[in-house]
Amino acid sequence: MASIAHAEQHAALTHHVRQAVTSGRAARMGSLPGTTQLDLAIMLPLRHEGDLDRLLLNFADPAAPGYREPLSVKEFTAGYGPTQQDYDKVSRFAEANNLTIVATSPNRIVLDVRGSAADIEKAFHLSIGVYQHPTENRTFYAPDREPTLDLDVPLWHISGLDNYSRPHPLYKHRPVEANSNPDFSNPSPLTGSGPGRQYLGSDMRAAYYGSGPLDGTGQSVGLFEFLGYELSDVTLYFQTVNQPLNVAVKGVSVKGAKLGCPAKFCDDTEQDLDIVQAISMAPAMTEALVYVGNNDVDIFNQMATDNIAKQLSCSWGWDPVDSNIDDPIFKEFAAQGQNLFAASGDNGAYVGTNKNNDDAWPADDANLVSVGATHLVTQGAGGPWDSEIAWNFSGGGPSPAKLRIPGYQQLAGVINSSNAGSTAYRNAPDVAAEGDFDNFVCSDGSCSGGWAGTSFAAPRWAGFMALINQQAVANGRKPLGFLNPLIYRIGIGSNYDSDFHDIVSGNNTKFNAVVGYDLVDGWGSMNGSNLIDALAGKAK
């Protein structure tokens, strides 16, 4: 886990140097010019984390005090956030080292600063080199040693010291995949209501929920994005499929990030499909909040400190230098009744390759819901669920970063010889939804079919959770928050088969879909009002 620099002079941090640098796999090409401006997010650790962990356990336990009693940002900060005194000391340290404070954070977890490479090297006693990337045709910059600093305040992490891993969206397109894979075959049968029998977002609502009264009223969904989007592509989709768009789409610029396309042309496929899929599942939600930023720490932290959307979705993958970097924020999500769904990746089983590592994070973190993908067949266009098998590109397996297995996966019966899961490390995914090469998308000014990926599954689950929380609120309850402790209890319970569609056929090249939990599609896909009633109580 992340190593905290304790209160002593020249305190050293860990997990800031890339393995490619320490091993020599990345050849050093020179030094980063000292005038280069870098944006850093300095993170402080939580306080009383043991107490917070107990609070989170109680949050999901009906017999415990604090059951489903979410905290406000102010309450979380007062109880578990860094102190104002420590935050101020870090601010003064930054300014004393010629680092400009770009933004502060209400929860005091993140301090955003900007400075020259020369000043950053001096402040943290390191050298930032330029290296040849070992697996990509480009160079990257990174520190050659761990940061040490003259500061009597503990730090959690300093984000932004390297650009080794570039985030990428977790979707695929049939023409591209067919050209590169001789074994590729088109999904069959096709039962969608869109052009070419492709699936529309509304088909997912019909298949996984039905025609009931829940529509997301009063709820918001938050979408995590690294690039901006064009709203015209969203409206193009709904106009093309002849459906109304009654949900406000609101862009949230994180630290000044551009909300629209940064150039005359940009690929906003990921952003558009996230928006469309979430809205289609909950077509009367209050708003879809599209958080656009340049680094994961700032985007996630903005979602937490806004604390508006209780259902969040991330369909991007990257390989962090420290796999625990975002944990303080993920725990704040849970304490505030927010739930993050993360796409599990589109390259099959996690087998330790660089591509798998880029796909697995953040989905293999234990404090969020990892979402795999399936091939769904409905009972005709716009019809109910009929059958479902595993999508063989669905990411899953034990954590490549060897993150410790969480308590909810240690429940009796979850990990067994049939699913071949790990008893030591976090297993992914947790749940799944449709994501085969049979989805219709509008982006970059045009529309086409043949799109796939766990990128579709994650926002579909976020939209579905808006329905769950809508019913919970109508029943006089608070938002459910982090779902995994609840889902896994359902999974080992007597009503599992009625609450989930258990995926028992197919594989992701290493792991098989089996009865119960598996490392291809988790517990499976949502079974409409049955699952909603199990989580939110029957509608009154």
Protein language model annotation of sequence segments:
Residues 1, 62-65, 504-505:
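A short, ordered amphipathic alpha-helix with a cationic face
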Residues 3-7:
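Sec/Tat signal peptide C-region and signal peptidase I cleavage site
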Residues 8-106, 112, 117-373, 395, ...:
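Substrate-binding/charge-relay-adjacent region of secreted/lumenal peptidase catalytic domains
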Residues 333, 342, 368, 378-384, ...:
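Predominantly extracellular beta-rich ligand-binding scaffolds that present long acidic/polar faces
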Residues 362, 391, 408, 441, ...:
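Short clusters of hydrophobic/aromatic residues that line enzyme substrate/ligand-binding pockets
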Residues 383-394:
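Phosphate/diphosphate-binding glycine-rich loops and adjacent basic-rich segments that engage nucleotide
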Residues 418-419, 469-519:
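An often Trp-containing, charged/polar helix-loop segment at the C-terminal end
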